[in-house]
Amino acid sequence: MGSVPDGACMSTLNEVLDQRVGEAARELYEKLDCNRVRCYACGHCCPIADGQAGVCKVRFNRCGTLYAPWGYVGGVQCDPIEKKPFFHAYCGALAYSFGMLGCDLHCSYCQNWVTSQALRDPYAIVPPVAVTPELLVREAFKQGARIMVSTYNEPLITSEWAVAIFKEAKAAGLATAFVSNGNGTPKVLEYLRPWVDLYKVDLKSFDEQHYHQLGGRLQPILETIRRLYAMGFWLEVVTLVIPGFNDSDQELTRLAEFLVSVSPNIPWHVTAFHKDYKMTDPDDTGPETLARAAQIGRKAGLHYIYAGNLPGEVGDLENTRCPNCQELLVERFGYRITDYRLTPDGRCPMCRTLIPGRWDSVFRGQITDHPYVPR
């Protein structure tokens, strides 16, 4: 079955998705007594009774075996890698993004709520489309993509499907990436490490109570960031700055100081909130707030700070500069590269400082976005 008719009820979507599953990777769960299992795909580490699902609602226990989503997408699109955002990886390249349904958090401002909250919100009805990894990789090549990205919903809870796709992608010469809330576990990161090159974490707050409101905890995300860096994933971190929620100087300072404690070379993207989904009370984030967050990050010691979602309004904060001599290295307007000056080995052309990232030996120019819907 490839789609859900308009107006389908929640139970119908559940019934469809129950048929789009496979056994979870044995590395990602353990069997307990009384046909219970414990899942390690995300930081909730849910103990799941027979016949029940985890917090994510898409990983479930059937007779003592854990099942995970398989064989479909809830959305795909081809657009610049800068949109993910990754600013220190394959500048200007196209990223072929795919996602499934479900999430282990329930953020009230989620911009992808139609896919992430599809099993919690009766208004979030998305038709799952049956596909194979081979088809997705072929379509990525047709669109001119160089990176496959698991995104839109939370990819950790659909890691098995992402790995199946990434195995095909890497065999074909493509890079791979996760765009994630970072609520991981050591087991899932070990499972992903051979197949994932780039990893973006949404560090949504630096306050435990704020994370509780979103349905999670802060510490698993912080530990995931530490592990991602130590394990050699290329890591970039994004914080959506929301007025009245996470924009205080104190919270932003603690967050930036934490990132510096992992590495001052982690790119930190501070992005502007706009009213979405259920969060319609705060004002939209202005450029002055992003500039303040960037100044806090610089004071803490971060070398690469970017402001997003307000193209042309944030001055130099869309660009990459050498932290040693301040030479302009990559100039951007939104997702578009307007100038590129890095050397083939990723160095500043003036002082030869090595800029951390995953750089192409030759800048291949900016490619515009190409939306794609699978057939």
Model-predicted segments: where are they?
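Short recognition patches in nucleic-acid-associated and regulatory proteins
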Residues: 55-58, 63-69, 329-337
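Conserved Radical SAM active-site core
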Residues: 61-198, 367-375
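Cys/His-rich metal-chelating microdomains
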Residues: 45, 49, 59-62, 106, ...
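Auxiliary Fe-S-binding modules of radical SAM enzymes
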Residues: 2-50, 249-375
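Residue-level detector of family-conserved "landmark" positions at structurally sensitive sites
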Residues: 120, 150, 179, 237-238, ...
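Short, cysteine/histidine-rich loop/knuckle motifs that typically chelate Zn2+
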Residues: 41, 55-58, 102-105, 109, ...
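Conserved AdoMet/S-adenosylmethionine-binding subsite of the radical SAM
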Residues: 130-289, 293-296
